[in-house]
Amino acid sequence: MARRYDSEAVRNRVLSTSVRLFLERGCHGTTMAAILKEADVSSSSFQNVFGNKDGVMYELMKLMFSGQFSAADSAAALLGPNASPAFAYAFETSVQLTIAELSEIIRDLYLQAYASERSLEYIRRNTAKHLQKFFQQYNPSFDEEDFYQMDIGTSGLMLGFMLRPCSDDFPLDVKIERYLQMSLSVLNVPAEERTTIIEGIKQQDLRSIAKAAVKQLFDVLSDTFDLELQAQIFGEEECDKEESAE
């Protein structure tokens, strides 16, 4: 019994330390040695609980993605009672792309999640269930495994668009529209409906929504790991600055 509690203490210390270091330095800038030193745990204790750094990333990734589809489930209401079920997916993925543009540290966290095979498999399996909910009517013969296979492709699209930062020649609104055109087309949403969905997404204040989502994530992390996290990662790293209306 003591061993179980010792493992739980190690898990909590490592995750708490990793959250803080990842947000301060990014995943690539955080070494295993730094995590072990600041968490005050031995290498053997760490390996017994997590195996390696990817094991830590997997646990944090589950927290990062846990609330995203709950927001997507309610997003369709933004277009009214006749909203397309695909709008919830478009909304969620648009917010995700926007979050990745708020800070290079956040982009790094997302990219690490997509780069880890274990984390990516978790994302694909969970996303496939939501794809089936949102897109079954467009693909009536598909089962969950079919949607899983589709998500192998759409998650590749997401990773590709996340890897390429915005620029003057490739602003965020263009990035989101390109992604939605491609992903919704792959999922067999009719062209006219794709246009309606994309126009609906353009009406949303995605930056404000994305910042609120990150703040909510920080609140969850703060409560879970008893940390004081402040969203100081929003700053000059943001691309596609909007011009002042005045």
Q: Where are these predicted regions, by residue range?
A:
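The short coil/loop that forms the "turn" connecting the two helices of the helix-turn-helix
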Residues: 9-10, 41
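Short, hydrophobic secondary-structure boundary micro-motifs
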Residues: 107-112, 193-196
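Amphipathic alpha-helical packing segments from all-alpha helical-bundle domains
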Residues: 72, 112-163, 170, 174-181
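Pre-recognition alpha-helix immediately N-terminal to the DNA-recognition helix
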Residues: 12-21, 95
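An amphipathic alpha-helix adjacent to DNA-recognition modules
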Residues: 11-16, 28, 48-73
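C-terminal peripheral helix-coil segments that are non-catalytic and often amphipathic
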Residues: 136, 167-246
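Hydrophobic alpha-helical connector segments
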Residues: 59, 70-106, 124-128
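Helix-turn-helix
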Residues: 21-55, 59
